[in-house]
A protein has these predicted regions:
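Terminal alpha-helical segments
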Residues: 1-121
């Protein structure tokens, strides 16, 4: 099975590059590393969980909502990181790509911290 954390490692390598393509790719790979960690936790918690193909990302982040403060934070910040990833992947003009990279890494670190708190041992 693929180790999704390898995307985070790649994102960290790309984040300090000067070209916008590397910065955008960094955000995208970071997002997928965090998304898959979150999704796999949900799937471990509930082996019968079926993530739909359509709107899978919304489903995953929404699934954390409403349970407790930690899970609500994961849900909220997951949606924030997804918004940044969508901007990086789909917007032709990003005014300050380096700020978007920094913001994305800050959000991701919060999510990963919270995910580590709830991750089944």
């Amino acid at each position: 099975m693929f180790d999704w954390n390898e995307f985070k490692i790649l994102a960290e390598k790309l984040k300090d590059e000067k070209d916008e393509a590397s910065q955008r790719t960094s955000i995208s790979r970071l997002y997928y590393a965090v998304y898959w960690k979150a999704r796999l936790i949900l799937e471990r918690e509930d082996p019968n969980l079926r993530v739909p193909e359509y709107n899978a990302h919304k489903f995953v982040w929404d699934k954390f909502s409403g349970k407790n403060k930690t899970r609500n934070a994961i849900s909220r910040k997951g949606r924030d990181l997804r918004r940044n990833r969508n901007d990086a992947d789909y917007e032709a003009d990003i005014r300050k790509p380096k700020e978007l990279v920094n913001d994305s890494f800050q959000i991701a670190e919060h999510i990963l911290f919270y995910l580590n708190q709830i991750q089944p041992k």
